[in-house]
Amino acid sequence: MGNSSATEDGGLLAGRGPESLGTGAGLGGAGAAALVGGVLLIGLVLAGNSLVCVSVASERTLQTPTNYFIVSLAAADLLLAVLVLPLFVYSEVQGGVWLLSPRLCDTLMAMDVMLCTASIFNLCAISVDRFVAVTVPLRYNQQGQCQLLLIAATWLLSAAVASPVVCGLNDVPGRDPAVCCLENRDYVVYSSVCSFFLPCPLMLLLYWATFRGLRRWEAARHTKLHSRAPRRPSGPGPPVSDPTQGPFFPDCPPPLPSLRTSPSDSSRPESELSQRPCSPGCLLADAALPQPPEPSSRRRRGAKITGRERKAMRVLPVVVGAFLVCWTPFFVVHITRALCPACFVSPRLVSAVTWLGYVNSALNPIIYTIFNAEFRSVFRKTLRLRC
């Protein structure tokens, strides 16, 4: 049971050997189908994900923390379409026979591992970012620096997972040059655990906690807004003072809202802020107004999540669900072949789950178009400008 056969070892481009699809397919039958399907897939991935990147870069309304990660995810899919899919399609057209150099095969394996891992890690990074924004708002930075650092970390970790392949791990004695696959079973297990089986449960747990916290926050905000509504008297009698506005003084205009907590007021001229009439009763009313403590006001501002961010978050469960549907079969087959060399896995099944995984790279722009009205309108605007 050597490690040089693609039917004995799983790889992120598993089954690239003469036995994977029978004899060389060339441009007849399966080879022609692979060529047409591959060209269409590459075109869809390039067009859709380029549109995502251009739209976010050109439209300020889309430049949100969540969409920074979506651009990073689109970049991983674009690199996959440029660096991996052409060679994958070439191998499929040849019936699974690798006719190029072993060194190019190792580079292909490393890029495939890195980009697949980067996609998963970017989804995990989104879950971490949203979890912090909802549950620890005081520590959340909306300016983008933390998000960019998190994105950089995802790419560095992805490169670290893939680096052993280009550092000689695939150079084993008796290697078959007609087969392009990962030659080390231990590394197959290691990369599968690091790239999929470990981050996916963590990501799902964080998303569950995030949306649970968001529902609680919105319910509390709704209750607080209703409790602050001023009560108007329904009949004759002295006016009822609003506990949130302080004592009632008929000679005074209503107090300026959030004068101490609004950051925009700090830029107004003093003359503008002092133009309301004043009287001794007004001074007394202002002194009697209950002021919330400063840390509490900062906490309310920090916990606020914009409507645009909430819209961006609604599409995330669909993106994660599509990713899991497309990649889970591949990784299950992938690790099964590594842990059970005696188990027979149909080469056509291996090819099918590999294609399914790559199809995911074309799905995300379609998901954004269907489930996010803001992305949809910007896509239309961008296409009109380019056409």
UniProtKB/Swiss-Prot annotation:
Task: Describe, from its UniProt entry, the tissues in which this protein is expressed.
Answer: Detected in olfactory bulb, hypothalamus, olfactory tubercle, brainstem and striatum.
Q: According to its UniProt record, where is this protein located?
A: Cell membrane
Q: Which residues lie on this side of the membrane: Extracellular?
A: 1-34, 91-106, 171-186, 338-346
Q: In the UniProt record, does the keyword rRNA-binding occur?
A: no
Q: Which PROSITE patterns match?
A: G_PROTEIN_RECEP_F1_1, G_PROTEIN_RECEP_F1_2
Disulfide bridges in this chain: 105-180, 340-343
Q: Which InterPro entries match?
A: Dopamine_D4_rcpt, Dopamine_rcpt, GPCR_Rhodpsn, GPCR_Rhodpsn_7TM
The glycosylation sites annotated in the UniProt record are 3
Transmembrane residue ranges: 35-57, 68-90, 107-128, 147-170, 187-208, 315-337, 347-369
Q: Kindly state which keywords UniProt assigns to this record, in alphabetical order.
A: Biological rhythms, Cell membrane, Disulfide bond, G-protein coupled receptor, Glycoprotein, Lipoprotein, Membrane, Metal-binding, Palmitate, Receptor, Sodium, Transducer, Transmembrane, Transmembrane helix
Give the observed phenotype of the deletion mutant: Mice show a significant reduction in daytime contrast sensitivity.
Could you state a single Gene Ontology molecular function term? metal ion binding
Q: Gene Ontology cellular component?
A: centrosome; glutamatergic synapse; plasma membrane; postsynapse
Residues on the membrane's Cytoplasmic side span 58-67, 129-146, 209-314, 370-387
Q: Name one Pfam family in it.
A: 7tm_1
Q: How does it sit in the membrane?
A: Multi-pass membrane protein
| Lipid-bearing positions (S-palmitoyl cysteine) | 387
What quaternary structure, including any partners, is listed in this protein's UniProt entry?
Forms homo- and heterooligomers with DRD2. D4.7 allele exhibits higher affinity for homodimers compared to DRD2 heterodimers, while alleles D42. and 4.4 have similar affinities for both. The interaction with DRD2 may modulate agonist-induced downstream signaling. Interacts with CLIC6. Interacts with GPRASP1. May interact with ADORA2A. Interacts with KLHL12.
Q: Which family does it belong to?
A: Belongs to the G-protein coupled receptor 1 family.
Name this protein carries in UniProt: D(4) dopamine receptor
Species per Swiss-Prot/TrEMBL record: Mus musculus (Mouse)
